[in-house]
Amino acid sequence: MIEITMWMQSFLQKLNETFASRVWFVGLQGSYGRGEATENSDIDVVVVLDKLSAMDIQTYNIMLDSLLHRELICGFISGKDDIMSWEPSDLFQFCYDTTPIKGSLDEVMALIDESAVNRAIKIGACNIFHGCVHNMLHEKSEDILRGLYKSASFVVQAIVFKHTGNYIKHQKDLLKVTSYDERKIIETFMTLKNGGTVDLNLMSETLFAWSKKWIAKGQ
């Protein structure tokens, strides 16, 4: 598995050489950010520059091509002006799932209010409902179902935050504080994540009913 601390040091060195004082924030998301990475985990790097142009994107791409494990690098890049103008409901997951490496997202987090959290739940539930119905009717894909349960786990994090004011990163910790319906979603997600057996019909019906419930709660 990648020694992420050493890899990030190399990444930061290259980034600073490439963009110098224009680097406003660097962070790590996903399994490496949570300390749950495996050999197959992507490296989800967040970079925010003072501003971002199409030329900057090409420059960043060239920089990434010079790094080890290029095939695993993904993540997000933007300008500060872009992220400060972003849809606040999207910023909820973005900010709380990002481990800072350089700089701070405090200015961005100040944009997240109760309304943004409620919208994160409602929009997430709507998207899951749509994806679930489409998959039940057309694709019938186990991979799509896994992705939908992953998305649902993010919605559960927002639900717990709404009720407690605490953002809980780790799924096993979510199990301790969720109600029965949300616990069932997290348990199923963890089963799928760990390669468990997929019951496409039952798991789809459970997810459909759960997303439908949260859409109605947003009325």
Language-model region placement:
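Structured loop/turn residues at beta-strand edges in well-structured enzyme cores
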Residues: S21, S41
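Short gly/ser-rich loop at a beta-strand->alpha-helix junction or flexible surface loop bordering the NTP-binding
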Residues: V23-Y32
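Catalytic core of pol beta-like nucleotidyltransferases
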Residues: M1-E17, G33-E39, D50-Q219
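Short hydrophobic/aromatic beta-strand micro-patches
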Residues: V46-V48
